[in-house]
UniProtKB/Swiss-Prot annotation:
CDD domains: S2P-M50_PDZ_RseP-like (cd06163). PANTHER family: MEMBRANE METALLOPROTEASE ARASP2, CHLOROPLASTIC-RELATED, REGULATOR OF SIGMA-E PROTEASE RSEP. GO terms for biological process: proteolysis. This is Putative zinc metalloprotease CPn_0344/CP_0416/CPj0344/CpB0350. InterPro entries: PDZ_sf (IPR036034), Pept_M50_Zn (IPR004387), Peptidase_M50 (IPR008915). It is found in: Cell inner membrane. Coiled coil: none annotated. It is an enzyme of class 3 (hydrolase). Zn(2+) binds at H20, H24. It comes from Chlamydia pneumoniae.
Length: 621
């Protein structure tokens, strides 16, 4: 099937080129220009045939095409009465026609691509649009960069506007910050659990070339049976069911996989605390006792507690909380790091004198012995939501945010949370279930050696030594990262904007990309050439016809915008020359024109080769 998809992808690209060149051909003939050849592809011809004075050919390099019109590329030509000195005097030549007729011919190619895009998007619209992951078009934030989080933006917040414009998805924030260097966001915080709903705004300087991606969209974290749990998964005995959605972990409402990864990789204990008549949860750092400053008395007390807890490990590997905790679990003081230049991780809320620890990682404790024993290993507390068939149905993207926010049922969740850490917790409330605490395992212990071997084989194929070393270093670090050994997916939504909206959005994105390239905010290495386009179309065919229609429309529209740019060699460059003739009412000096065209032709070829090599490098690693 892969070969079939590749053939279909190449065919789709050929159609895009054919439509563009056909636009030039039809209008050129209509205004009386003599067309010498019509080619799909460049280089030596694989097939050619002359029909009606026009040589139709298919080149051996299939990425592109051209229409050769008489007199367009020559300064001198022989006519019936001898040598013709000017391209303007060539019968039926390109320059023999008025500038307005030439502009019609030049515009016809991009216009044909625009019409193809309109057709593709219209069929897509009438067919109901395409399926996208909810996170791709979510106004709700799933993950936030620390720079924005410090300004008050949190996961779960709904963004209303970005720099004065309606917010559609995380791509808006990335492109806006890329071009303008700052973000002005109007935000709505829904009333999750006991948090009151409110609206507010932030204004912050943000450079994605320095900080990276500002945020990502919220996602349903759904467990399906398509990818079964691995044999050594920590979740193997957790009674997880198909269509369970992860909604809460260690005191955090979940909106993205990034949050889960952060919770697993941070060395924190989930602590239930009593302070006077108030009970609350707080994530507290688990730190090695060897990095804390103890008086001899406190050190001996901790060693005694270690003995009572049955912990036989060395002092250098003993974990604890950075507090002085008496035998009943009360906080009697706070400990500091031995090395002031290596500060301790910050707690979610600092514990105070007289606070009492009631539970660690969802397990009740009676005193310091239980506390010390439980903090040696982090076990995550997880609440899942069993999704009903109605909740799994695909909805229109316009209604998706409202449904997502409403899917967190505070009353049922609070029933479980209010009794968490007790000897008889509430394990089920409405669609929610509290799973038994789960201890993550290192990735290397969860997944088979075959998975590691496959990734090592991928690394060996990377030709660039620096990138290969970076990949291997990342792989080595990933091996030890805590994992639940589970694959979670997002829900699909139906994305079906009108063809006009699609055309407008793609045009804006194309111009934004070009602006980012010119200003240096975007590297050319992120662009795709013909090989990349074929690869994208190949992926589209493997997903479905709707996806192919979208990519054909998008690429066709991008081709139209690109060709209309006022750059010599492109259609837009020739249009600019024609407009110059109209304004000045003087013929062009073809020698000067050629001097302008030659270097730009050379640069275009170099750029084309660069993009092709970039595509091949990405494709083959």
């Amino acid at each position: 099937m892969t070969i079939i998809y590749f053939i279909l992808a190449a065919l789709a690209l050929g159609i895009l080129v054919l439509i563009h060149e056909l636009g030039h051909l039809v209008v050129a003939k209509a205004v009386g220009m003599a067309v010498e050849s019509f080619s799909i592809g460049f280089g030596p011809a694989l097939f050619k045939k002359r029909i009606g004075g026009i040589e139709y050919r298919i080149g051996c390099i299939p990425f592109g095409g051209y229409v050769r019109i008489r007199g367009m590329e020559r300064t001198k030509e022989k006519g019936e009465k001898g040598k013709i000195d000017s391209v303007y005097d060539i019968p039926q030549g390109f320059f023999s026609k008025s500038p307005w007729k030439r502009i019609l011919v030049l515009v016809a190619g991009p216009l044909a691509n625009i019409l193809l895009a309109v057709l593709a998007f219209s069929i897509l619209y009438m067919n109901g649009g395409r399926s996208k992951n909810y996170s791709d078009c979510s106004k709700v934030v799933g993950w936030v960069h620390p720079v924005l989080q410090a300004e008050g933006l949190l996961p779960g917040d709904e963004i209303l506007t970005c720099n004065g414009k309606p917010y559609v998805g995380d791509k808006d924030m990335l492109t806006t910050s890329l071009l303008e260097g700052h973000l002005n966001l109007e935000i709505k915080r829904p009333g999750y659990l006991t948090v009151p709903s409110k609206e507010f705004a932030i204004d912050v300087e943000f450079d994605p070339t320095k900080f990276g991606v500002p945020c990502s969209g919220a996602s349903y974290l759904l467990y399906g049976n398509q990818v079964p749990l691995t044999k050594n998964s920590p979740m193997e005995n957790s009674e997880l069911r198909p269509n369970d959605r992860f909604v809460w972990m260690d005191g955090t409402l979940l909106f993205s996989m990034a949050q889960i990864s952060q919770i697993l990789n941070e060395s924190y204990a989930f602590v239930k605390v009593a302070r006077n008549d108030k009970i609350f949860f707080s994530r507290q750092p688990r730190v090695l006792a060897s990095v804390l400053h103890y008086t001899p008395y406190l050190r001996n007390e901790l060693i005694d507690t270690q003995y009572e807890a049955g912990l036989k490990g060395k002092w250098s590997s003993l974990y604890t909380l950075p507090y002085v905790i008496n035998s009943y679990g009360y906080i009697e003081g706070e400990l500091t790091a031995i090395d002031p230049e290596s500060p301790l991780p910050q707690p979610q809320e600092r514990l105070q004198l007289g606070d009492r620890i009631l539970a660690i990682d969802g397990t009740p404790v009676s005193g310091s012995v239980d506390i010390l024993r439980l903090v040696q290993n982090h076990r995550v507390s997880i609440i899942v939501q069993q999704m009903s068939p109605q909740e799994l149905e695909e909805v229109n993207s316009r209604d998706a945010d409202k449904r997502f926010i409403a899917s967190y049922h505070s009353e049922d969740l609070l029933q479980i949370l209010n009794h968490l850490g007790e000897s008889h917790p509430v394990e089920v409330a409405g669609p929610y279930r509290l799973l038994d605490p789960v201890q993550p395992r290192p990735w290397i212990d969860v997944y088979s050696s075959e998975s590691l071997d496959k990734q090592l084989e991928v690394a060996k194929k990377i030709k660039n030594k620096d990138k290969q070393r970076y990949y291997l270093e990342r792989l080595d670090a990933e091996k030890q990262k805590p994992s639940l050994g589970i694959s979670l997916k997002d829900l699909k939504v139906r994305y079906n904007p009108s063809p006009v909206v699609m055309l407008s959005n793609i045009t804006k994105e194309s111009l934004i990309t070009l602006k980012a390239l010119v200003t240096g905010h975007l590297s050319p290495q992120w662009l795709s050439g013909p090989v990349g386009i074929v690869q994208v179309l190949h992926t589209g065919w493997s997903v479905g016809f709707s996806e192919v229609l979208f990519w054909i429309g998008l690429i066709s529209m991008n081709l139209a915008v690109l060709n209309l740019l006022p750059i010599p060699v492109l259609d837009g460059g020739y249009i600019l020359l024609c407009l110059w003739e109209i304004v000045t009412r003087r013929r062009l000096n073809m020698k000067i024109v050629e001097r302008i065209l030659v270097p730009f032709t050379f640069l275009l070829i170099i750029f084309f080769i660069f993009l092709t090599f970039q595509d091949l490098f990405r494709f083959f690693g």
